[in-house]
UniProtKB/Swiss-Prot annotation:
It comes from Macaca mulatta (Rhesus macaque). It comes from the Eukaryota. Coiled coil: none annotated. The chain crosses the membrane at residues 19-39, 58-78, 92-112, 222-242. This is CD151 antigen. Residues 1-18, 79-91, 243-253 are cytoplasmic. A lipid is attached at residues 11, 15, 242-243 (S-palmitoyl cysteine). Structural component of specialized membrane microdomains known as tetraspanin-enriched microdomains (TERMs), which act as platforms for receptor clustering and signaling. Plays a role in various cellular and molecular mechanism through its association with both integrin and non-integrin proteins. These interactions facilitate critical cellular functions, including cell-to-cell communication, wound healing, platelet aggregation, trafficking, cell motility, and angiogenesis. GO terms for biological process: cell migration. Belongs to the tetraspanin (TM4SF) family.
């Protein structure tokens, strides 16, 4: 009877080992995906980040990059702990899983909270940022972001082309009589912003506030979904780890 129980325990341990190994392979790939999403958020349209008053969006992306890197290291550690049957490594592995789980939950919550606040933040800050920082010394990133937004999303101004009347740059001599930046033009040539002509200036209502809000919200949905989804999958990893740890403890005795 004792021999039967021992074989049963050993068989269960072997099954758990292979199950946890398979999980760790998938977990490593998931870590790569999480890190890729974080890097994608930072790299793709990174100039737009300079237009945001809050650092929440940036913090969320950095958390994902860090979490993804730690996940990949943890996946390798999990494979070593599983096949070497070292309970101390399994304990460390479980603690790392728990830390990553909390990081991804935090990233998901930050993404959700910022998603709710985004519209208010853009309306309160973007027009003022555009008026006071566009083409001003030390704010080249803002200038580049605004020009890129207007050309890519075919719009002019934060709400409409009239917003540029409040621009400090427009009132300066270096603007050379422009009423809007050249990036507002459908066909961009030097000095085309000197005439607010209906046929060559984008007149889309809603301006780039609406476009930028939609763009960032799409990114936040991806960040929130990836962070929360993989965090939920990690629960299974922690359960498998606890089961294997307990099984090794029983075999030890």
């Amino acid at each position: 009877m004792g021999e039967f129980n021992e074989k049963k325990t050993t068989c269960g341990t072997v099954c758990l080992k292979y199950l946890l190994f398979t999980y760790n392979c998938c977990f490593w790939l998931a870590g790569l995906a999480v890190m890729a999403v974080g890097i994608w958020t930072l790299a793709l349209k990174s100039d737009y980040i300079s237009l945001l008053a809050s650092g929440t969006y940036l913090a969320t992306a950095y958390i994902l990059v860090v979490a993804g890197a730690v996940v990949m290291v943890t996946g390798v550690l999990g494979c070593c702990a599983t096949f070497k049957e070292r309970r101390n490594l399994l304990r460390l592995y479980f603690i790392l899983l728990l830390i990553i789980f909390l990081l991804e939950i935090i990233a998901g919550v930050l993404a959700y909270v910022y998603y709710q606040q985004l519209n208010t933040e853009l309306k309160e800050n973007l027009k003022d940022t555009m008026a006071k920082r566009y083409h001003q010394p030390g704010h080249e990133a803002v200038t580049s972001a605004v020009d890129q937004l207007q050309q890519e999303f075919h719009c002019c101004g934060s709400n409409n082309s009239q917003d540029w009347r409040d621009s400090e740059w427009i009132r300066l001599r270096e603007a050379r009589g422009r009423v809007v930046p050249d990036s507002c033009c459908k066909t961009v040539v030097a000095g085309c912003g000197q005439r607010d002509h209906a046929f060559n200036i984008y007149k889309v209502e809603g301006g780039f506030i609406t476009k930028l809000e939609t763009f960032i919200q799409e990114h936040l949905r991806v960040i929130g979904a990836v962070g929360t989804g993989i965090a939920c999958v990690q629960v299974f990893g922690m359960i498998f780890t606890c089961c294997l740890y307990r099984s090794l403890k029983l075999e030890h005795y």
